[in-house]
A protein has these predicted regions:
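His/Glu-based metal-binding/catalytic segments typifying zinc-dependent metallopeptidases
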Residues: 1-44
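M16 family metallopeptidases and their MPP-like homologs
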Residues: 15-21, 51-156, 171-180
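A short, acidic, amphipathic alpha-helical segment used as a generic capping/interface helix at domain edges
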Residues: 156-167
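Short, conserved charged micro-motifs
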Residues: 26, 83-86, 184-188
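Short, conserved catalytic/metal-binding micro-motifs enriched in Asp/Glu and His
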Residues: 32, 161, 176
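Solvent-exposed alpha-helices and their adjacent loops that cap or buttress functional pockets
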Residues: 6-9, 66-67, 168-169
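Proteolytic maturation boundary segments
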Residues: 1-4, 171-196
Length: 196
């Protein structure tokens, strides 16, 4: 599904999202690493391919939301309106690639190290630490130690990351929202581009 809000903006903003895994799903740790590999930092696949290599976007990244019974995986990008179709085509190609090709051990190792570093550094902040405790107490009913989470992350295999990608990146479950100076007649083309 595609939603377009025509607006006279300097750049076109897009969010490509899909329902994802709940905070209790067995593959939730693999999803965290899928997020890191695809778009959590400047070494991620989308940043390197879409921004650095092709110069299509000003900004790109992924975000995940975890809820009790579902979740969301969202890719955000900001680009020129004239580069919108190519940007979406390139993003979708990367999603198809991660479903098709197993992640190399070195890439997974770097993702685990990044995740671990971000978690531990984030918890040094008092507010972040309070949010860590409060969110778990309210949603799960108990508070896990950071080391427990990192143990689960450490056990994730390339096969599990690929399985998570195959589970969530399904063409009929992809939703695209676009804000910018894009003609309404381009919606049909955008829908076709979202087919993995």
């Amino acid at each position: 599904q595609v939603r377009l809000l025509r607006k006279s903006t300097e750049q076109t903003h897009l969010c490509l999202g899909t329902p994802a895994l709940s905070r209790f799903h067995p593959d939730r740790f693999a999803l965290e690493l899928l997020h890191v590999i695809l778009g959590a930092n400047m070494s991620s696949r989308l940043f390197r391919e879409v921004r650095e290599k092709r110069g299509l976007v000003y900004e790109i990244g992924t975000h995940i939301k975890r809820f009790k019974d579902t979740g969301a995986f969202v890719i955000y990008a900001g680009c020129d309106a004239g580069k919108l179709s190519t940007t979406i085509r390139t993003i979708v190609a990367e999603l198809a690639r991660i479903k098709r090709e197993r992640i190399h051990a070195g890439e997974l190792r770097r993702a685990k190290e990044f995740y671990s570093g971000q978690l531990l550094m984030g918890l040094e902040d008092t507010v972040e630490h309070m949010l860590w405790i409060g969110e778990q107490a309210v949603t799960v009913g108990r508070v896990a130690r950071p080391q427990d989470l990192l143990t689960h992350i450490e056990r994730v295999t390339p096969q599990q990351v690929q399985r998570a990608a195959r589970r969530i990146f399904v063409p009929e479950r992809l939703f695209l929202a676009v804000v910018g100076p894009v003609p309404q007649q381009q919606v049909a083309t955008l829908q076709q581009l979202c087919a993995l």
